[in-house]
Regions:
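Generic detector of well-ordered alpha-helical packing
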Residues: 78, 83, 144-146, 175-176, ...
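Metal-dependent enolase-superfamily TIM-barrel catalytic cores that perform enediolate-based chemistry
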Residues: 98-218
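Flexible, glycine/charged-enriched surface loops at secondary-structure junctions
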Residues: 40, 95, 145, 198-202, ...
Length: 317
C-alpha cells in the first residue's frame, strides 16, 4: 500500500494473440502463490524484484520451445514492472533509465501508426481514408499490409499511399511472414524504387536463411523480430539472418518474449554484437514498450490508433 491505498500492477499480452488464461491460472500464477516472500522481494526489502519473480515463474521450465508460455510470462512480467514503478513513485521509463540504463531518458519518442489491413470490400479509397486519419492525428510515418493481394494490386496500393504520405521514408510495409524466398525477392525488387522506410517480416521469422538471402538482393531497410520470443532466437537472427546493423530494424516485443527481464538480456546481447539499441522499434503498440523506448534509448514504438481497443487507444490524449 501507498498512503493507505492498494497498489495494483496491470499487465496484458500483445496484439493479435490468443489468450493465455489457462497457462496463467494453472501453471504460472500458482508458482507465485506458493513462493516465499524472500523469493519475490528485492534484497533491500523495499520493493518487488522482477528478476526474482521471473526466476520463480520459470522454475522447472525446459529451455527452448518459446511458444505461448513466453506470452504468459510476459503478461505477468508487465504487471510486475508496473507495480514496481508505482511503488517507487516514478514513471517506469525514469526507473529503467536510472537502474538499467545510463540515467538518461526522454519524454518524447518516435512513434508510427500501424494498420492498413485487408478487409472484404476494403478498396484503395478506404485504405487512403484510414491512412489520412493517422496523418490527421499527427503521425508522419504509417504502416500497411502487403501480400494479401496479387503483387500488381499491392503495388497500386503502395503507390496510392505514397502519394498521400509524400515520401517512401514515411511508409513501412508488412508481409506478416507470408512469403517464400522467391516471392519475398520478387516483392523486394518491385518495391526497391520506392525507398520505403522498411520491408517487414517477408518470410517465416525463424527462416534465417530466407532473410539473409533477401538482404543480399534488397538494398533498402528490412525489419523483423516481433515473432522471436527469446534472447536466443533474437541472437540467431543477428548471427544468421543477414540483418545489417546500419540500416535494418529489430522489432522484438517484450510482452511476447518473456517480458522485460528477458528483454534486458536481449538488449545486452545486441550490445555484444555491436548493435545499437536505437535500431529497435518494438512491435505491439503497448505502454510497456513505450516506456522501454523512452528509458532505454530504443528507436521508437509502434501504435495502432484505430485497432485492438482499448489497448490501441493510449495515444488518444
Amino acid at each position: 500500500k501507498i498512503n493507505g491505498e492498494n497498489v495494483v500492477g496491470y499487465g496484458f499480452h500483445s496484439n493479435g494473440r490468443y489468450a493465455v488464461s489457462e497457462l496463467l491460472k494453472k501453471r504460472f500464477i500458482p508458482r507465485l502463490n506458493e513462493a516465499e516472500e524472500k523469493d519475490l522481494i528485492n534484497d533491500e526489502g523495499t520493493n518487488f524484484s522482477p528478476e526474482k519473480i521471473w526466476k520463480v515463474l520459470m522454475q522447472n521450465e525446459k529451455p527452448g520451445g518459446h511458444g505461448e508460455r513466453s506470452t504468459a510470462v510476459g503478461t505477468i512480467d508487465m504487471a510486475v514492472w508496473d507495480l514496481v514503478s508505482k511503488i517507487e513513485q516514478v514513471p517506469l521509463y525514469e526507473y529503467l533509465a536510472n537502474k538499467y540504463g545510463n540515467g538518461k531518458f526522454t519524454n518524447k519518442i518516435f512513434v508510427y501508426a500501424a494498420g492498413g489491413y485487408y478487409y472484404p470490400g476494403k478498396d484503395i479509397p478506404m485504405l487512403l481514408d484510414e491512412m489520412k486519419s493517422y496523418l490527421d492525428l499527427g503521425f508522419t510515418t504509417v504502416k500497411m499490409k502487403i501480400g494479401g493481394a496479387p503483387l500488381k494490386e499491392d503495388l497500386k496500393r503502395i503507390e496510392s499511399v505514397l502519394k498521400l504520405v509524400g515520401d517512401g521514408n514515411n511508409l513501412c510495409v508488412d508481409a506478416n511472414g507470408r512469403f517464400d524466398i522467391e516471392t519475398a525477392i520478387e516483392y523486394g525488387q518491385a518495391m526497391e524504387p520506392y525507398n520505403l522506410k522498411w520491408y517487414e517480416e517477408a518470410g517465416d521469422p525463424l527462416d534465417y536463411e530466407l532473410n539473409s538471402e533477401l538482404s543480399k538482393s534488397y538494398k533498402n531497410p528490412l525489419a523483423t523480430g516481433e515473432n522471436l520470443f527469446s534472447m536466443q532466437d533474437s541472437r540467431n537472427l543477428i548471427r544468421y539472418g543477414g540483418m545489417r546493423k546500419e540500416t535494418d530494424w529489430l522489432q522484438f516485443d517484450c510482452s511476447l518474449s518473456y517480458g522485460l527481464v528477458e528483454y534486458l538480456k536481449t538488449l545486452k546481447m545486441m550490445d555484444e554484437y555491436n548493435w545499437s539499441s536505437t535500431r529497435v522499434i518494438p512491435h505491439g503498440g503497448h505502454q510497456l514498450s513505450c516506456n522501454i523506448a523512452a528509458g532505454l534509448n530504443l528507436g521508437g514504438n509502434e501504435i495502432y490508433p484505430s485497432l485492438f481497443q482499448p489497448f490501441g487507444g493510449f495515444p488518444d490524449s
